A protein has these predicted regions:
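Short, basic/aromatic beta-hairpin or loop at an interaction surface
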Residues: 7-21
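Glycine- and charge-enriched low-complexity intrinsically disordered segments
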Residues: 68-84
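Short alpha-helix capping/helix-loop boundary micro-motifs
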Residues: 23-29, 50
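Short, compositionally biased
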Residues: 31-32, 53-66
Length: 84
């Protein structure tokens, strides 16, 4: 599943990123924010207009607004929370 399809409030680990879908400068910035393979993320909110863009993504203690086109390049695996 890709990050743009991850249900809201579901923790997931980024399992792969197709960097070829992104402009080099955008890819560099996303890596600098920690959005790379192995990072644990959670979709907190989606936009309400224009294709539900952008997505509010939590990574650690940081909240990042991410365009859907960028989220489409990231494959994720949902994590099972302890006690769930």
């Amino acid at each position: 599943m890709t990050l743009d399809n991850l249900p809201t409030d579901t923790p997931a680990r980024i399992s792969a990123v197709d960097w070829s879908q992104l402009v080099e400068e955008e890819a560099r910035r996303l890596r600098a924010l920690g959005l790379d393979v192995g990072a644990v993320v959670r979709v907190e909110h989606r936009g309400v207009l224009f294709g539900r863009d952008p997505l509010a993504i939590r990574i650690g203690r940081m909240m990042v607004a991410l365009r859907r086109v960028h989220a489409c390049a990231m494959s994720v695996e949902a994590l099972v929370e302890v006690g769930a």
